[in-house]
From Swiss-Prot:
Site (Transition state stabilizer): K64, D67
Enzyme Commission code(s) on record: 4.1.1.85
Organism: Salmonella typhimurium (strain LT2 / SGSC1412 / ATCC 700720)
Name of the protein this chain belongs to: 3-keto-L-gulonate-6-phosphate decarboxylase UlaD
GO biological process, one term: 'de novo' pyrimidine nucleobase biosynthetic process
UniProt-listed Pfam families: OMPdecase (PF00215)
Pathway entry: Cofactor degradation; L-ascorbate degradation; D-xylulose 5-phosphate from L-ascorbate: step 2/4
């Protein structure tokens, strides 16, 4: 089982605040996510600028595309994104359109499982050639005190068994990682737990050490 990658989510409102994070920890992570908040605040230039600074890193545009899949994904890929996200409630043709464009750029598409979705949809994504999904505990759910539970672990295992590469996100803390041991997680996303740490560098390194211990 290969080691899960570590992704930092830049859900900053401005590039200046995003750079405060990347200057510290870009070299400690595998994937740099231009979060939805930053995508809205700064547009695709955020993707372009971060990829120019860190060409050796995977840069994800978390656009959460809901419609106009080909147009919006092309905007992201032309800005040199490696991956883009499509929201789970989008029509299957939106996901297919985004994937078609991704292939032109040797990129990839992730389905963001935020909110309601069904296993029938999951099978449609697999049939369409989608390989990646993001299992998401929403920011609002976290704020309401909703913790990771057995239902989450069961769903993640089932998605993995279907052949998906599963990314896990949603207020992920270091102490949560053992919950997922034994599952071939593709990526763990840490946002505020790294960005807002007293030492973001040490926080990122602790995540990497824990991943190596649990999956190594």
């Amino acid at each position: 089982m290969s080691l899960p990658m570590l992704q930092v989510a830049l859900d900053n409102q401005t590039m200046d605040s995003a750079y405060e994070t990347t200057r510290l920890i870009a070299e400690e992570v595998d994937i740099i996510e231009v979060g939805t908040i930053l995508c809205v605040g700064e547009g695709v230039r955020a993707v372009r600028d971060l990829k120019a600074l860190y060409p050796h890193k995977i840069v994800l545009a978390d656009a959460k595309i809901a419609d106009a899949g080909k147009i919006l994904s092309r905007m992201c890929f032309e800005a040199n994104a490696d991956w883009v996200t499509v929201i789970c409630c989008a029509d299957i043709n939106t996901a297919k359109g985004a994937l078609d464009v991704a292939k032109e750029f040797n990129g990839d598409v992730q389905i963001e499982l935020t909110g309601y979705w069904t296993w029938e949809q999951a099978q449609q994504w697999r049939d369409a050639g989608i390989q990646q999904v993001v299992y998401h505990r929403s920011r609002d759910a976290q704020a309401a005190g909703v913790a990771w539970g057995e239902a989450d672990i069961t769903a993640i295992k089932r998605l993995s068994d279907m052949g998906f590469k599963v990314t896990v996100t949603g207020g992920l803390a270091l102490e949560d990682l053992p919950l997922f041991k034994g599952i071939p997680i593709h990526v763990f996303i840490a946002g505020r737990s790294i960005r807002d740490a007293e030492s973001p560098v040490e926080a990122a390194r602790q995540f990497k050490r824990s991943i190596a211990q649990l999956w190594g």
